[in-house]
Regions:
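N-terminal helix-turn-helix DNA-binding module of bacterial transcription factors
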Residues: 1-72
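Alpha-helical recognition/docking segments in bacterial nutrient-uptake
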Residues: 7, 11, 25, 43-46, ...
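Short, solvent-exposed amphipathic alpha-helices that sit
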Residues: 11, 88-102, 186-189, 211-231, ...
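Periplasmic-binding protein-like
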Residues: 79, 131-140, 201-207, 261-271, ...
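Short beta-strand elements in bilobed, periplasmic/extracellular small-molecule ligand-binding domains
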Residues: 101-111, 204, 221-251
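Hydrophobic alpha-helical segments within soluble ligand-binding/sensing domains
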Residues: 167-169, 174-204, 214, 248-255, ...
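An alpha-beta-alpha
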Residues: 188-229, 341-356
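Flexible loop/turn connectors
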Residues: 256-365
Length: 365
């Protein structure tokens, strides 16, 4: 079977980590690839901060050592439980993998397929596989799952970092380290941008089937208050077109009616896949984006590929995985320190401005 680019990158990182420094030509020979391919790989990995590169020579970053001369991450086994290995969490996993490789640790992955009742067994499987600490993104879809299937996380016998999930204030889970995107900030960025373009209170079209969707909804209500806006019509419930065609059509019709009646000229849509399909269906009904409706997508997996490239809020998913892994390695290398304060890190999304809200150039806010 042909080696994937990710597997080749792992081998390249292992070679540099083992040797400390190496020339690009030497790496090409050891990897069995052309010098051009090796150079491209090195540039990519150096751009991600995983390697240092100077004049054809590659070195392992000196800053990877633990502060104070303590144990490094070399040889650590880290576990990662994710609800999915695709779409949103693919980038989170990639960031975690890169950070683990940089630390000299090995990352072991388990996927729950959004079955929260299996989270505990899969996490115990990670521990049985040798994980010394775990990154956990439970398969919760809402607060009821968190209440029913969450308490065990606080009882794990190893350092644990919660990924892209928030705990109920005051609960045992609230005492865990966690790293998550600040979706409230992302919603605020989107609404401020639409208001700056002269639109009245934008509508929200959003799902209800994930913690991200619920965080976007909560962030919308909070942003309205922050911006001093009157609450418009209720949030339009969106569903995937392939899962519920009738529900999807109801959402499109509700947005169509709001636009054609003059009640709304701007909307934020979660997520970008739904946004692309909604824009296509609106066009069939005679509503044009951005001429009749300024639209921003929440999430930026495929937003740039739409016929009219969509302005999008981009959660920092790769950085979430990276920072969470670095935090876990820090906990493991520092040893048991009961005085070490637990951290709740909220990483800020960016707004990538494209054509769907009336802009003509691509930029990030």
């Amino acid at each position: 079977m042909r080696e994937s680019a990710a597997e080749r990158h792992d081998r390249l990182l292992a070679l540099v980590r083992e040797r400390g420094t190496a020339r690009v030509a030497e790496l090409a020979e050891r990897l069995g690839v052309s010098p051009v391919t090796a150079r491209r790989d090195v540039e990519l990995l150096a751009g991600r901060g995983l390697l240092d590169r100077v004049h054809g020579q590659v070195s392992w970053p000196e800053r990877r050592g633990a502060p104070g001369g303590g144990r490094t991450g070399e040889g650590l086994v880290l576990g990662l439980l994710a609800p999915s290995a695709t779409y949103y969490f693919a980038e989170v996993i990639r960031g975690a993998h890169e950070a683990a490789a940089r630390a000299g640790a090995r990352l072991v992955l388990r996927v729950s397929d959004y079955r929260p009742e299996e989270d505990r067994a899969r996490t115990e499987g990670l521990l049985a596989a040798g994980a010394e600490g775990v990154l956990v993104a439970p398969g919760w879809r809402g607060p009821e799952d968190r209440r029913a299937y969450g308490d065990w996380l606080a009882e794990l016998p190893v350092p644990t970092v919660l990924l892209e999930r928030r705990a109920e204030p005051g609960s045992p889970l609230d005492g865990l380290d966690r790293v998550a995107s600040d979706h409230g900030h992302g919603v605020l960025l989107a609404l401020r941008h639409l208001l700056a373009l002269g639109h009245a209170t934008p509508l929200l079209v959003a799902r209800r089937d994930s913690p991200t969707a619920l965080a976007v909804r909560a962030g919308y209500a909070e942003a309205l208050g922050t911006l001093g806006l009157a609450e418009p019509r209720p949030v339009i419930d969106s569903v995937p077109a392939e899962a519920d065609p009738e529900g999807f059509e109801r959402a499109v019709r509700a947005l169509h009616d709001a636009v054609t009646s003059g009640l709304a000229g701007a909307a934020l849509v979660h997520n970008d896949v739904d946004a692309i399909e909604i824009v296509q269906r609106l066009a069939e009904l005679g509503v044009r984006v951005p001429q009749d409706l300024a639209l921003i997508a929440y999430d930026d997996e495929v937003a740039a590929l739409a016929d009219t490239p969509l302005t999008a809020v981009a959660p920092p998913k790769r950085q979430v995985g990276r920072h969470a892994t670095e935090l876990l390695v820090e906990r493991l290398t520092e040893g048991a320190d009961e005085d070490a304060a637990r951290r709740h890190l909220g990483l800020l999304p960016r707004l990538r401005v494209r054509d769907s809200c009336g802009a003509r150039t691509t930029s990030s806010v």
